[in-house]
């Protein structure tokens, strides 16, 4: 898959360099010579990162560099001395303390192990614990990327339309594969779209993903508010792959306009912002909603649809046409990913022979029963052994 040749490396490299905090390929300033201590007979190495133990198998030799820290834990870049590949290793501390978070971790591991696509981030390793009975922290090594779309949008670096178009194409190309696996991502946003200096884009964070045929959807927080479609804002439980398409439309306009399209402070304002742009839906467009949702919309002020072309005069009219078809109120009338890829705006990139699908639908069967903490530990432990069979008898 070839991307835009013009200025690609320079623009992305400069954009990455301009960001705060440092992108994942850069060490955090001031962190040098992190001490390493061999443990468990030399089979593991312990590092002290921000006062936390970071313990990985001995193939991840020094130096190791912290590249991110969040509520989930710490991420470090490390070199796998066996494959000579740099990876981003995420430590999820006390991963089994919260059952919902543990299930998210298990779901992401199983999904990413199932998928194999250029535009979906790959898991390179799941590091087994030194002792099975003391298994509390989960370490997952992903392929290392340079930055994410959120950082690029927030940087002051200009991007050509060619770059934006190529990013959109890759998101849709990856999403076609995801949807063909019978999976909805459900949390697409700029932070979950990773980039490298070649403009390669990879979708990440599948912790909220779900099977498309599932009916009991509303058990967890789904889709960051700004990228949430009307059917979710109105509590429709019967949603489809169209939710991801809406999110992509919002992301693309944010990329073109360098600010969020619908930055709502809460559910109520979020719905108002999107209706101020796309207009109050007709009765026909509300057919899919329940009576309570219809009643709520009818009592709101009447909003007239704005002209996207007039509101965004700097955006290519062909791009506007595509976005308008992705941001339709009625999910049944929203473009599918395949339709979006075939849109005239993407003609220069679209190649159906190079847009693979997943041949085997993903099964969420492991979630059909209420898993205990110990069962989730065992399932993740087995995934680690699949990468590291030599640690079977530790």
Curated annotation (Swiss-Prot):
Compositional bias per record (Polar residues), positions renumbered to this chain: 1-10
Record-level Gene Ontology MF annotations: ATP binding; MAP kinase activity; protein serine kinase activity
Location of region: Disordered: 1-27
Disulfide bonds: none
Modes of activity regulation: Activated by threonine and tyrosine phosphorylation.
Motif TXY: positions: 219-221
Residues reported to bind ATP: 67-75, 90
Record bears the keyword Kinase: yes
Catalysed reaction, written as an equation: L-seryl-[protein] + ATP = O-phospho-L-seryl-[protein] + ADP + H(+); L-threonyl-[protein] + ATP = O-phospho-L-threonyl-[protein] + ADP + H(+)
PTM summary: Activated by cold, wounding and UV-C in a cultivar-dependent manner; phosphorylated at Tyr-221 in cv. Subicho but not in cv. Pungchon.
Domain of life: Eukaryota
Known function: Protein kinase involved in oxidative stress-mediated and innate immune MAP kinase signaling cascades.
The name this protein goes by in its record: Mitogen-activated protein kinase 2
Organism (species): Capsicum annuum
Gene name per UniProt: MK2
């Amino acid at each position: 898959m070839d991307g835009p040749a013009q200025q690609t490396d320079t623009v992305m490299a400069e954009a990455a360099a301009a960001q705060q905090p440092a992108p994942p390929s850069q060490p955090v300033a001031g962190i040098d010579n992190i001490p390493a201590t061999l443990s468990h007979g030399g089979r593991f190495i312990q590092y002290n990162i921000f006062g936390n133990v970071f313990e990985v198998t001995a193939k991840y030799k020094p130096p190791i560099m912290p590249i991110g820290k969040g509520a989930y834990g710490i991420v470090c870049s490390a070199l796998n001395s066996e494959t000579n590949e740099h990876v981003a290793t995420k430590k999820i501390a006390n991963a089994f303390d919260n059952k919902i978070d543990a299930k998210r971790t298990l779901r992401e591991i199983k999904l990413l192990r199932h998928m194999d696509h250029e535009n979906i981030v790959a898991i390179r390793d799941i590091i087994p614990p030194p002792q099975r009975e003391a298994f509390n922290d989960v370490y997952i090594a992903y392929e290392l990327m340079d930055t994410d779309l959120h950082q690029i949008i927030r940087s002051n670096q200009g991007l050509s339309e060619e770059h934006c178009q190529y990013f959109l194409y890759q998101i849709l190309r990856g999403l076609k594969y995801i949807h063909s696996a019978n999976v909805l991502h459900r949390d697409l946003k700029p932070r979950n779209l990773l980039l490298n200096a070649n403009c390669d884009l990879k979708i990440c964070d599948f912790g909220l993903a779900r099977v498309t045929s599932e009916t009991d959807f509303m058990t967890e927080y789904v889709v960051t508010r700004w990228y949430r479609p009307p059917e979710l804002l109105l509590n429709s439980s019967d949603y489809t792959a169209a939710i991801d398409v809406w999110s992509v439309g919002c992301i693309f306009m944010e990329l073109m306009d360098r600010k969020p399209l619908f930055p709502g402070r809460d559910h109520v304002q979020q719905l108002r912002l999107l209706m101020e742009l796309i207009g109050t839906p007709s009765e026909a467009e509300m057919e899919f909603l329940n009576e309570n949702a219809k009643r709520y919309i009818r009592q709101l002020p009447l909003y007239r649809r704005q002209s996207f072309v007039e509101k965004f005069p700097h955006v290519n009219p062909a791009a506007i046409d595509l976005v308008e078809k992705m941001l339709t109120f009625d999910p049944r009338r929203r473009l599918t990913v395949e339709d979006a890829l075939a849109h005239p705006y993407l003609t220069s990139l679209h190649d159906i022979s190079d847009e693979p699908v997943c041949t085997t639908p993903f099964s969420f069967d492991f979630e059909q029963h209420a898993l205990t903490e110990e069962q989730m530990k065992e399932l993740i432990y087995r995934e680690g052994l699949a990468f590291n069979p030599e640690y079977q008898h530790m």
